[in-house]
UniProtKB/Swiss-Prot annotation:
This is ATP synthase subunit a. It comes from Methylobacterium sp. (strain 4-46). Keywords: ATP synthesis, Cell inner membrane, Cell membrane, CF(0), Hydrogen ion transport, Ion transport, Membrane, Transmembrane, Transmembrane helix, Transport. F-type ATPases have 2 components, CF(1) - the catalytic core - and CF(0) - the membrane proton channel. CF(1) has five subunits: alpha(3), beta(3), gamma(1), delta(1), epsilon(1). CF(0) has three main subunits: a(1), b(2) and c(9-12). The alpha and beta chains form an alternating ring which encloses part of the gamma chain. CF(1) is attached to CF(0) by a central stalk formed by the gamma and epsilon chains, while a peripheral stalk is formed by the delta and b chains. It is found in: Cell inner membrane. The chain crosses the membrane at residues 29-49, 56-73, 87-107, 117-137, 159-181, 192-212, 218-238. CDD domains: ATP-synt_Fo_a_6. It is a multi-pass membrane protein. GO terms for cellular component: plasma membrane; proton-transporting ATP synthase complex. Belongs to the ATPase A chain family. The gene is atpB. It comes from the Bacteria. GO terms for molecular function: proton-transporting ATP synthase activity, rotational mechanism. Key component of the proton channel; it plays a direct role in the translocation of protons across the membrane. Its main location: membrane.
Length: 251
């Protein structure tokens, strides 16, 4: 019983298929990988179903898909500015991937993939590497103007450059921790309050208080649904802002 009530137990990785060991490291296909494959499959299926007809007068599914895409396209354009259209597919894919994974975590007994820092960090690393690679491809060494804001006095440039470099390097950390921490904390709180209900029901007369944690669990669940959507949007928005540096370094 103690294991079931452990709020951290839900984040434990469980190997589904083992591929042996490399040194002391166990290599396995876990439920985390399964949920990520499922998310990609669901997104691909919905996209194919929604766009299979490509009618001039769109149906409900096509209208919904277009609304989602146009919403992200608008976000990218507002955050990254001119020339950002080429990054809309990337940001849209990241948004949908994070959104579906977050919503998976709201299903009872499902696994919350985005509660693992390694997953969110790799997603953030994709963003930063895209910024760096495209920045150098499009602007060459002038991409480094990103670290030298215009109008800075010469004597102050070494300090400003150092601060800008540290800030840039910390971006994947802050981007990944923001998503990871929000999903982790919310699911821990939900598990704790949900665990109070059977505990109070088994405590005799104290069972009359069980509706209180039940109501809190419902409220936290609703809040977590909102957080799941908002965190996907925040991830997409920050990605767009970071991509603007690749498009317009030094501005």
């Amino acid at each position: 019983m103690a294991v079931k009530l452990d709020p951290i137990h839900q984040f434990e990785l469980k190997p589904l298929v083992s591929f042996g060991h490399i040194g002391h490291q166990h290599i396995a296909f876990t439920q985390s990988a399964l949920y990520m494959f499922a998310a990609v499959g669901i997104i691909a299926l919905i996209t194919l179903v929604a766009t299979r007809q490509r009618a001039l007068v769109p149906g409900r599914m096509q209208s919904l898909a277009e609304a989602f895409y146009e919403f992200i396209a608008s976000t990218v354009h507002q955050s990254a500015g001119h020339g950002s259209e080429r990054f809309v597919p990337l940001v849209f894919s990241l948004f949908m991937f994070v959104l579906v994974l977050n919503l998976f975590g709201m299903i009872p007994y499902a696994f919350t993939v985005t509660s693992h820092i390694i997953v969110t960090f790799m997603l953030a690393l994709v963003v930063i590497l895209t910024v760096v690679i495209y920045g150098f491809m499009a602007h060459g060494v002038h991409f480094l103007d990103l670290f030298v804001p215009p109008g800075v006095p010469g004597w102050l440039k070494p300090l400003i450059v150092a601060i800008e470099v540290v800030s840039f390097i910390s971006r994947p950390i802050s981007l990944s921790v923001r998503l990871f921490a929000n999903m982790l904390a919310g699911h821990i709180a939900l598990k704790i309050f949900a665990g109070f209900v059977p505990a109070l029901l088994a405590a005799g007369i104290w069972g009359i208080l069980s509706p209180l944690p039940l109501a809190l669990s419902v409220a936290i669940t609703a809040l977590e649904m909102l957080v799941a959507v908002l965190q996907a949007y925040v991830f997409a928005t920050l990605t767009s802002i970071y991509l603007s540096d690749a498009l317009h370094p030094g501005h």
